[in-house]
């Protein structure tokens, strides 16, 4: 690979978001996930927060459909902190929803709000199961003797204020779906665009492993995809934008990897220096004892 820095700090859409930002395609993805058959895009209200940025690009899509408020995020690296991020995101979404719908949260009447749903589409290189669930409660620092990890319902009398055991005040559940080629075949079959996205990412990785120059690898991957009718409509019309997105995401991944390597090297060097210093101290102490 070339060592030329290609990091672009302007906020951009991630390729996944760019593809599924179209309400029609987003509706298709939702239908594939849920086994539904919505066709009217006017049923879908996009609620994506425009000021939420991951690294230097935007990888999120949120929307309301029926009684559900869904948050879709794409991740190319596994992040166990997604439920915590989801907590902050949904907090902002609900605050916005309450304001836009003139809901009085101080009223004696119970407010009606959409059901939250959090889906993470993962296509990183780290081996992961086809589907898994991440929970905010997994991150809680300490489970005291009074902590009850069992799920309870609102009607469960053991969850009242006089109970010795207590439930955490909140929980956020994120469902992670592996969209690398070879995973979740049924879902991929139902949503052609998701399948093509996964196939295109696979092509990019293949060419990156073969070529010395990332720009050449991306160009070859785009040409190969178009010739095989993979994301052809998107790639033919938005070639420059797609190339820019891929380079941005690729270099963010490289940036993260480099930072980890730097941290490791710094830690190793600090450890060596501390070891040398400790050896000097022990030598002096031994001389004094003599």
Positions of PLM-derived features:
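Elongated, amphipathic alpha-helical interaction scaffolds
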Residues: 1-290
């Amino acid at each position: 690979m070339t060592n030329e820095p290609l990091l672009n700090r302007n906020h951009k859409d991630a390729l996944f978001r760019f593809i599924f930002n179209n309400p029609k395609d987003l509706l298709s993805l939702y239908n594939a996930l849920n086994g539904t058959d919505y066709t009217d895009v006017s049923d879908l209200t996009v609620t994506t927060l425009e000021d939420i940025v991951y690294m230097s690009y935007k990888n999120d899509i949120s929307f309301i459909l029926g009684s559900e408020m869904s948050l879709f995020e794409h991740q190319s690296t596994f992040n166990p902190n997604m439920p915590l991020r989801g907590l902050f995101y949904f907090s902002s979404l609900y605050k916005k929803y309450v304001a836009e719908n003139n809901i009085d949260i101080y009223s004696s009447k119970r407010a009606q709000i959409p059901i939250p749903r959090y889906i993470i589409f993962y296509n990183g290189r780290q081996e992961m199961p086809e589907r898994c669930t991440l929970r905010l409660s997994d991150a809680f620092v300490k489970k005291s003797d009074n902590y009850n990890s069992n799920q309870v319902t609102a009607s469960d009398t053991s969850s009242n204020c006089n109970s010795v055991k207590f439930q955490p005040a909140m929980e956020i559940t994120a469902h992670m779906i592996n969209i690398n080629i070879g995973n979740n075949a049924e879902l991929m079959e139902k949503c052609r665009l998701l399948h093509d996205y996964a196939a295109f990412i696979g092509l990019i990785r293949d060419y990156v492993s073969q070529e010395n120059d990332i720009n050449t690898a991306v160009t070859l991957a785009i040409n190969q995809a178009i010739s095989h009718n993979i994301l052809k409509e998107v790639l033919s019309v938005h070639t420059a934008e797609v190339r820019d997105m891929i380079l941005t995401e690729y270099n963010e991944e490289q940036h993260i990897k480099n930072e980890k390597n730097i941290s490791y090297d710094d830690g190793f060097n600090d450890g060596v220096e501390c070891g040398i210093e400790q050896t000097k101290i022990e030598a002096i102490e031994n001389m004094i004892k003599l």
